[in-house]
């Protein structure tokens, strides 16, 4: 039996991974990790929505130490104000790198993969499905093929059962992910990419700020990828 744990953070990438895993595995478990991020409450509600929508069990794990370490580093993703950017600014590598530094949670993907690996090791093995992609890999080193390769090397020594990291989006940008979401029939408008979400609409859609890097990447990817964006924004993203 093929088993997968999907690291689910609520955005386009992990939503695409969830639909993909549901199609490709016999058993799928969603794993959402809380560490005090600004969008945590919204993320949890989004996770609960897709858990019910796809009939996939959900585990939410809280890591207080990661919240403490994030505040120690001063990441804006935990209790801070994230930078506002435009689509044009995203093309400036220096701006993109500075934004990435601002929202960096110390060793987050290493920690999250370790948590998922522990769960799968307890269950007898399986795949950790992650939403790493080419667009974010350009500024986040822990979203690259090299990172996946090194983590899989580590897991050979760190687990008793056979556990590996699988990154189905690793060669896709946001446009490609948008196309995949459409192909899979995903209700992406119920996902959340925003670093500073403004709550929910009456019918349960997250309200995105429209000004943070993640909102701009989301809007640009959907518009250029599938020619539409059903996301609700407080402010229309500038792409």
Curated annotation (Swiss-Prot):
Entry's cofactor comment: Binds 1 zinc ion per subunit.
InterPro entries: QueC, Rossmann-like_a/b/a_fold
Cofactor(s) annotated in UniProt: Zn(2+)
Binding site for Zn(2+): 194, 209, 212, 215
Catalytic function, reaction form: 7-carboxy-7-deazaguanine + NH4(+) + ATP = 7-cyano-7-deazaguanine + ADP + phosphate + H2O + H(+)
Gene3D superfamilies: HUPs
PANTHER family: 7-CYANO-7-DEAZAGUANINE SYNTHASE
Protein family: Belongs to the QueC family.
Protein name: 7-cyano-7-deazaguanine synthase
Organism: Thermococcus kodakarensis (strain ATCC BAA-918 / JCM 12380 / KOD1) (Pyrococcus kodakaraensis (strain KOD1))
């Amino acid at each position: 039996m093929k088993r997968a744990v999907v690291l689910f953070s609520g955005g386009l990438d992990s939503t695409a991974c969830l639909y993909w895993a549901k199609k490709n595995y016999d058993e799928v478990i969603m794993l959402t990790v809380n560490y005090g991020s600004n969008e945590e409450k919204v993320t949890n509600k989004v996770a609960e929505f897709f858990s019910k929508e796809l009939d996939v069990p959900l585990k939410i794990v809280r890591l207080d130490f990661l919240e403490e370490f994030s505040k120690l580093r001063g990441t804006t993703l935990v209790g801070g104000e994230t930078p506002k950017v435009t689509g044009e600014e995203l093309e400036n590598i220096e701006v993109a790198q500075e934004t990435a530094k601002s929202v960096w949670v110390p060793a987050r993907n290493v920690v999250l993969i370790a948590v998922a690996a522990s769960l799968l090791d307890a269950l007898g093995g399986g795949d950790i499905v992650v939403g790493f992609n080419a667009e974010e890999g350009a500024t986040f080193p822990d979203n690259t093929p090299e990172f996946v390769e090194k983590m899989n090397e580590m897991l050979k020594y760190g687990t008793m059962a056979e556990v590996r990291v699988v990154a189905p989006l690793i060669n896709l940008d946001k446009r490609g992910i948008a196309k995949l979401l459409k192909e899979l029939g995903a209700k992406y408008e119920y996902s959340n990419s925003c670093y500073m979400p403004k709550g929910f609409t009456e019918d349960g859609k997250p309200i995105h700020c429209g000004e943070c890097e993640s909102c701009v990447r989301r809007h640009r990817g959907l518009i250029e990828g599938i020619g539409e964006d059903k996301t609700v924004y407080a402010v229309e993203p500038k792409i």
